[in-house]
Amino acid sequence: MNRPTIIDFVEHYTAKYADHVFLREKVNDEWTATTYTQTREQAHLIGAGLMALGLKKGERVALLSQGRNLWVTGELGILYAGAVNVPLSIKLEEASDLLFRIQHSDAVMIMTSEQQLPKIRKILPQCPNVRQVIVFDTLEKYEDRETGIDEVIRLGREQLQKDHKAFEQRYKSVQPDDYANISYTSGTTADPKGILLTHRNYTANVEQARSVVGIDVDDVMLIILPLDHCFAHVAGFYTMMSYGGSIATVPVGKTAMATLRNIPIAIRETQPAVMLSVPALARNFRKNIESGIKAKGPKVEKLYNIALRNAIAYNKEYWNRGGWQCWRYPLVKLFDRLIFKAVRQGFGGKMKFFVGGGALLDIELQRYFCAVGMPMFQGYGLSEATPIICSNAGGAAIFGSSGRIVANEEVKICDSEGNIVPDGERGEIVVRGENVMAGYWKNPEATEKTIIDGWLHTGDMGYVTKKHPGFLWVVGRFKSLLISADGEKYSPEGFEDSLTDGSPYVEQCILHNNQNPYTIALIVPNKDTLRDYCKQQGVDPNTEAGQRLMLDKIQAEVDAYKPGGKHAGVFPEAWLPKALAVLPEAFTEQNHLVNSTMKVVRGKVETYFADRIDYAYTQEGKALHNPKNMEAVL
């Protein structure tokens, strides 16, 4: 295929893997299997049904639903009709957030689930351009402008029987550079931007992904990330389709928490070979594994820790595993049979690896999952690049790096003036390739600032080395840089991740310094572990003495990175926090301080807690036991 569209892509791989299972979904407590041929047939019916409802080529259709088969076939139906999908996050709770995206994209139809329908009904009176709301679930009564997906499929069947040629002409008229998707950014200080992704953006990125990550035919991927996110979109179902694999989705619960509880059950039942993950999920997986080990008693826990240390020492940074540590290999195999095989059984027993994205994955987590036999390979990308730029994989991985740059992609590291910096020096990551977006929808100014002479300026900071050609290291955001009073700059993510991953007493952390006299740390405490610590010391956590002790413990965790501490020298002392602002509220999706992949939105945090930041730069606020900190730990 030469520059295929998504339509060409689906037709090609359906012909190749016709009777293989592509979609897996739990219905009435039973997992159902939908083949490649059946998937395409349903996409054809939905696409023809949308045409029968009057959908024109190039029009936009918003899609708001939990992950399920109809999310996939719904999107494919939109694309077969020659239209553009506008995937929306189910985590958008504010009516204004949904309204902006639907109005800004000029959506003329909306596909949604029964669970998400109330959000749509609330804003529909303000959306006169929306002609039809298509509900994936059967309702007793449909309101104005609503219809069920079964009716769309019925209309599609009639349309194909009456004039199949018109439908075929429509989907064959789709060109590689036609828009396939408008993907909205999370947005930080302004309205989110609509990222315009073409058919060729998608198919090019799948080709690129295949150059670094391999999957076997009939492997299963359980998709636990939101399908509206570009990472799940491409690294998930389109890449799996290209290998003849299948995708399963987590059964939807009545609440978000119920859906989360379904994840471990779905993992055991679907026995995935690969999953996509983000750091927040990775930490939860590790926490659950270690809770299970602890429950087996001190002897098992001790053996587990010995096995873990041995495997981590043997694996080193993965690319250099073994070497003079080869004497550990027999122990690695022995402990794997005794300990880690049981851990993997909790993940279905067939897990080969995770692909980590969405945010930087701490190197200790990478070492951990490799040790237990389920490597979590860090990748890097952004929606504007559809999204994959590089990834580690079993054939080539370096812990701490973001992986090998995909094929047919140019990457350069530039300074603030746009000049290429020498190998080893940090600068902005700038990329060029067929996966780079067409631009931002109805925002030519932002497009011109982001894409210059065909090069996408990512806003991320990284470097390359001569020692490992073709690999990229990502170290943070240009916009996240701490800026000292004398203009020096530093990327804070390394310290933040190290502290939150390494300390049981710190749940979340953001460093701040915007040309201030010193750096401060905004810290969300883990109150449960702090209160347990107090009780172990014989101090009531509800007393003033308890409050002081808990704050002292948090300070001790930070001080471990200072001279004399166990982590001394890991990070420059000049950038370590001189004051702590302990916060009374966590960064959550509800207060919009994390995005759909659980990545903290730094700008929003700094705005939300602006008063606490200002207070930390006062004489009273700099003191650890200040009134606001004392109150926050209770």
Give the ranges of each region predicted by the language model.
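Conserved ATP-binding loop and adjacent catalytic segment of the adenylate-forming AMP-binding
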Residues: 248-251, 328-333, 345-356, 361-410, ...
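AMP-binding/adenylate-forming catalytic core of the ANL superfamily
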Residues: 110-112, 433, 438-439, 449, ...
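Conserved pre-ATP/AMP-binding loop-to-beta segment of ANL
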Residues: 18-21, 153-184, 191, 214-220
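Structural core segment of the AMP-binding/adenylate-forming
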Residues: 2, 80-155, 169
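Conserved AMP-binding/adenylation subdomain of ANL enzymes
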Residues: 203-220, 227-340, 350
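Conserved AMP-binding/adenylate-forming core of the ANL superfamily
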Residues: 22-68, 76, 92-99, 148-156, ...
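Conserved ATP-binding/catalytic segment of the ANL
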Residues: 185, 405-409, 419-424, 428-484, ...
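Conserved AMP-binding A3 loop
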Residues: 33-37, 180-206
